[in-house]
């Protein structure tokens, strides 16, 4: 199957190429970039040297000749090409935020008018597998909502309040340098940001509601001085107390058939470079602390996008993604 990666020069584009090298049915035939036309992909992603001869092309959606496309472009950019890909019959996973939320919610949260809205399945396979399977266009979830939702999902309908506290690596900010991600400001440091106003909260609320929850949801992210990973602590305040054995049994049953969700003490090192989400819980009566760990670039972005592609195209869900973590 021939694949195009639109916006391939960033971290998620590089991860898509790295992971697709292990996919027996995937052949990446196009990697686009507006600014790097003619530049070898391996010059930007040096870990791929010797593994790909691709060069970046400044190609529009109308010029792409492929069976499948990944949109690895910023929000507002995806909406400008999604319609063209759909019209041409190119199945697509969109890694931007453009199709994750209802139109009115998106426009309120992101402060822009959606120029080409249509409904798309929300690509969290553990919760929406049936909608994703066979779809022609899927909206890949945000990194924070992935870790947060998987941490709280089994208990969401029993909660009256869920407080998400997430710590993320710097790669989540993308490749463009800024004062926030400048090494002297990040190294040997730790800080919260967007304390009450992070856009990903809207996705967390949406998924909690889809799980039958009426819980109030709150979210504060923090920036860690590491490259990869998100560790999320979900404080789940229950309407009725539940004991440790009951909560553990609930989580293990909920994720029993989910290859990519493992019940074990979450650490960033154990999931680095993988599509796994590690989850564990501890009960304090009417408060349960659920912790999850993901790699923000893999299960939080490119790996989950490939997981969605597999479902859309009829491949085994774990094809190309059975990768062990790089530990220690």
UniProtKB/Swiss-Prot annotation:
Keyword hit for Oxidoreductase: yes
Biological function: Catalyzes the NADPH-dependent reduction of N-acetyl-5-glutamyl phosphate to yield N-acetyl-L-glutamate 5-semialdehyde.
Keyword tags: Amino-acid biosynthesis, Arginine biosynthesis, Cytoplasm, NADP, Oxidoreductase
One GO biological process term: L-arginine biosynthetic process
Family: Belongs to the NAGSA dehydrogenase family. Type 1 subfamily.
Protein name: N-acetyl-gamma-glutamyl-phosphate reductase
SUPFAM superfamilies on file: Glyceraldehyde-3-phosphate dehydrogenase-like, C-terminal domain, NAD(P)-binding Rossmann-fold domains
